[in-house]
Amino acid sequence: MKIVVLGAAAGGGLPQWNCGCVNCSDARAGRLRPSGQSSLAVSADGSRWSILNASPDIRQQMQDRSVLHPQGLRGSPVASVLVTNGDIDHIAGLLSLREQTPFDLFATAGIHEVLEGNRIFDALARDKVARRPVALESPFALHDGLEAMLFAVPGKVPLFMEGESVDTGLIGEQTVGVRLSDGRNTAYYIPGCAYVPDDLLHRLSDAGHLLFDGTLWDDDEMIRSGTGIKTGRRMGHIPISGPDGSLVRLAGLAADKTYIHINNTNPVWRAGSAERAELARRGWQVAHDGLEIVL
């Protein structure tokens, strides 16, 4: 199995269009590697590929990876797209894939309802793009030789669907993780997770590689930096640090581990930071656009 990180950043990317924080400023100045928004490509054979989350940057992300280029006049090696929630940074890129080339669109019924509720996604011609609802805990083929299974993780509804009160620990079809298997190796992709319950730890025990939500280092990172008014947990993302952060909660896993979906404010972007060094000591790497993982 081969996994290619198309985008390592959280919503907005790095640099974010309206942000002058030190990370964004350094990314603009060439002192820090820019990053597109959260997306993966995965393949069992290096020929047919599936996209996990279609970010707003998907056209450029596919252009940057020759394995995703058309092999003829019209067409694509992309057999399917899977989305793990209804967030803008995971579904907006679907609109760039509307050019009459067939692929399967996998998501839970709940996430498909989000797409059905916005007619702009009717631009994906239904005679070309098959919308395939997937039940939780039910394995299915993303493409030949590559099996996926969706499972619920704690999260919330998309920002544009929030009401006056928001439950950030919902467990259901609105936020899912993905188990990937080629019959020999297993990887997990969880770009959004509000907290790590014990049953999730048990599930991940067979992971060969884990790509996990690395949105914020500190829960109040955006508030302290002056770039936002919400904590990570309010946004449905567990922080990396802290006594019940993901670094502590996932410490016992034997898998190789990669943080992905990283906010522009996160200090782990900086190779020389104390936070990056701490991750390395704990057996984690930080994703970057173009990172290749082979299992």
UniProtKB/Swiss-Prot annotation:
InterPro entries (alphabetical): Metallo-B-lactamas, PQQ_synth_PqqB, RibonucZ/Hydroxyglut_hydro
Transport among keywords: yes
One Gene Ontology term from the biological process aspect of the record: pyrroloquinoline quinone biosynthetic process
Keywords assigned by UniProt, alphabetized: PQQ biosynthesis, Transport
Biological role stated in the UniProt entry: May be involved in the transport of PQQ or its precursor to the periplasm, in association with PQQ biosynthesis, but is not absolutely required for this synthesis.
Protein family per UniProt: Belongs to the PqqB family.
UniProt name for this protein: Coenzyme PQQ synthesis protein B
Provenance organism: Ruegeria pomeroyi (strain ATCC 700808 / DSM 15171 / DSS-3) (Silicibacter pomeroyi)
Originating gene: pqqB
